Regions:
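Long, highly hydrophobic alpha-helical transmembrane signal-anchor segments
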Residues: 1-41, 95-113
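Alpha-helical transmembrane segments of integral membrane proteins
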Residues: 3, 7, 11, 87, ...
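Loop-to-transmembrane boundary segments
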Residues: 78-99
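Weak global preference for isoleucine
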Residues: 2, 11-17, 21, 41, ...
Length: 155
């Protein structure tokens, strides 16, 4: 069982690197713009029900907050900076989505091998380390979009 956890954790970190490599390669393709406006869960109530607020708190109060310093805001942010911040958030979101897909391949392999518990552990790690961060980025992008909409109405 320990082997399942260590392997899953290792593959999750490797998947982050794969995501960081794949995203810039695909950013030059036409369909990338469609990917940058994905929104899987638009309802804030559902986000709360699946524990996204708790996940956000855990990220903000753990060592994970240091993983992408470009996504931390220490001061009041200007409108132009907010748009750059949103673009960086989109990149981070897509990194995690591609990492989720990469790790999904390993999960499918384990299922075909009949290692169902191993696949379940990997799926849990994949959800926590790739899907939830992506959902959190989408949630934060929607918040930024609402704020930008208000700023555009005022000007």
């Amino acid at each position: 069982m320990i082997k399942y956890f260590t392997f899953s954790f290792s593959i999750a970190f490797i998947s982050w690197i794969v995501g960081m490599i794949v995203t810039p390669l695909l950013s030059k393709m036409d369909f990338f713009k469609g990917l940058s406006s994905l929104s899987f869960i638009k309802n804030d109530r559902i986000n709360t029900l699946i524990g996204l607020q708790l996940f956000k708190w855990l990220i903000m109060h753990s060592f994970f907050k240091y993983f992408n310093p470009k996504l931390s805001v220490k001061k009041r942010i200007l409108k132009t900076e907010l748009e750059e911040y949103r673009a960086e958030m989109t990149t981070a979101e897509l990194n995690h989505l591609f990492a989720f897909a990469f790790m999904g391949v390993f999960i499918i392999i384990k299922l075909f091998q009949g290692l169902y518990l191993f696949a379940a552990v990997m799926l849990l790690f994949n959800i926590l380390m790739n899907l939830y961060p992506s959902l959190l980025q989408q949630h934060n992008k929607r918040r930024i979009d609402r704020y930008l909409h208000i700023l555009n109405q005022r000007s």
